[in-house]
Each structure stands twice: as structure tokens, then as C-alpha cells.
Amino acid sequence: MESTFFSLGNRVKGSSFKSSSGLTGEPGVEEVYLTIDTDEKASFADELNSLYSTYLKTAEQYSLSEDTLVFSRFYIADIANQKTVLRESEIFGILKNSAVSIIQQCPAFGGDVSLLVYHIKHDGHAFRKEVFNCDTENRRNGAIIHGNNYDLLWTANFYGIGPFDPYKQTTEIFKSFNTILTMKGMTLLDSAIRTWVYVRDIDNHYKGMVQARKDFFEEHGLTPDTRYIASTGIEGFSREVHSLVAFDAYAVKNLTDGQIVRMEALDNLPPTIRYGVTFERGTRVRFGDRSHLHISGTASIDKNGEVMHLSNVKKQTERSIENVEALLSPHGAALQNLAYLIVYVRNIKDRTKVMDVLKDKMPSDIPILLLEGAVCRPAWLVELEGIAIIDDSNDFPPFF
């Protein structure tokens, strides 16, 4: 795997992963992740203009385009007051040409908006892409990317609707997601790989989301004996104040037995079902030329499921990194293989302490976004997530 990390000024960091060839001898596809920050001294409109020009410059320099665009997510400080300006901006006008998510999780440094973008390149050839919307205001949206061997489905901005009840809103969201899977010839058990579940006032509403997800999974064959889905459950806010849950997801069509692998590190973290939660610590997806290692939201936990280092955000950050390393290691992967890292901090005043640890413990070239987001237990002060990409060689068709 040819991996490259790059930066453009002090606001853009990126990673690129490309295999030399698949089993057919054809050149492998290239995956590119970008993180872009803004200047806190600018107005929100000016931040968006800056984001637009910075993204265009980066895209031009690294041969990215709307044809290679797969998924993006805006992290903003105040969705209630900034959503309209964002949706009318030039940068949104570009990124809505694939799956695009907007969530309120205030960037810890810089301005009011940060951006994560994912592109796939295949020797300059455009892939076939279907962008779809699931409501009249074009907010619930998604894209299916058609490859030679697999179809990649991304859904975004599935905000909670209905009664002011996290259980009912979560159930409706998963039903809607499952309907899309069915329409695209997929199933939850065979195809769903990764979810992000954002919960408003997580200290009060997480339990209802967890129970709804557990019940839905049991109905669709996701159990401790089969598998769950890699996931992050974190505080975040969608557009409506009465919307308690928001949801992004990723699924892959045409996977076969053996391609989805449960990631565990039992000396560090117990299975989540031990304390009634239904997600994988991590999920490896094996392709013929590479593996994707999806790391779920990972906090300062011990092998018995207890919080470690109460009230010490630096020690919690260190333990979270250790746990990520423990999940990666059995698969021949390390922190350096991460395409990006997202870090959530409960108290934004802890941002410098957390960043000091990240600078000390993480490879310096990994793109990192540090965001405000309370974790599912009040005692957890910080949480990490990301994806690693490594070489693989097997009889499965190569990626994409």
C-alpha cells in the first residue's frame, strides 16, 4: 500500500492510500481523506468562503473533483443559526453532489466550521454515482457509488422525526436506513459496516437510543453470535431542536463470507454487549488488495468495562490511544496506518490538554479533527475514532 500524508498551509491535512495492483494486475484505486479547518477571527460567511477556496485549491493540486467525491461532513458550532447560511454557500453547493452530513459539534480550535471529505480516484476515470434525497427539503440524503466489484452506500443527515422520544426516533431512523438497504439489494447483516449516531443531550437520551438499536438489531439477526456494526454514539445536534437523534451510515454491497471481521482487544476492552450496548469495537473489511479497519468510538475503558482515570483528561486520552492501538495490532496495523482521527472532548476547555497528548502520542502527519462532543458516559471525558487502511492479499475481489 502506497500511503502519503500531506498538508496545504496550516488549515488542510490529508491522507492518500493506493495499492499497486489488484489480483487482475490492474492499478488499484486511490482513497483520499481531507480535513480542513477555518480561522476563528472571520465571520461564518467568510469562513465558508475560505473553506470553498481552500477546498478548490486542494482539489486542483491533488486531482480531485466532483466525479471523485464520495462523502463529506461539516462540523459547525451553532446549527440552529448557521444551517441556512451553510446550505446556501458555494462549498455546500459542491459537496451536495454526493452524500453530505451537517452536525453541530463545535471545532475545538479555529473557526466555527471544520470539514471532513472522502474521495475515491481510479486512474482519472469517473465512477458511476447516484445521489439521492429522502425528504422534500433535501436534508436526508445519500449516495451509492458503483464500482467494478462493490457498491458503496453512504447515507447522511438522517435526523430524528416524530415524538420527542429517543427510542421512537431511533427506531424510525433504522427502519428508514434498512428500507434503503433493501432497495439497493443489501441487508443490515450482510452489508452495513459503520454508523455514526448523534444524540442530543446524550446524558439523558442515550439509553433510549441504545435500547431501540438493540431491539432493531435483534429483529434483523444482529446478535453476539453473528455480528454488530462499528459505530460512534456521541453527543451531536441536527437541525431541529426537537430532533433527538441524527445518523450517518456506510454499507458495502457484494461482500461475501469472511470479508467482515470482528476487531477485538479483550485484554483492553470487553465486548460491548457485556454492558448492554450493541456495536463492534471495530470492524475490518477485507478486500483483495487492502483492508479497511473501522475503529468505533473508543474511550478510556478497562477490560472489565470500567472507566479509567476518572477526572483526568490527559490520562484518559492516553488510555484511549492505547485501546485504539490494541484494536489495530492483531491485524498488523498501527497508528501510522490511520487515514484520519476524530477526537471528541466533553469539556472544550480541555482541548489544549488533549491536543498536547495527541501531539506526544500520535504520528504527527495524521489528519486530526478535535471537536466538542460529550461521550455516552458522563465520566468519559474524551473519545477517539478513525479508519486505518492497510495492504491485504487474498482471494476476494480488490477494493472497488
Predicted regions, residues:
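N-terminal presequence-like segments and the immediate start of the first folded domain
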Residues: 1-339, 345-400
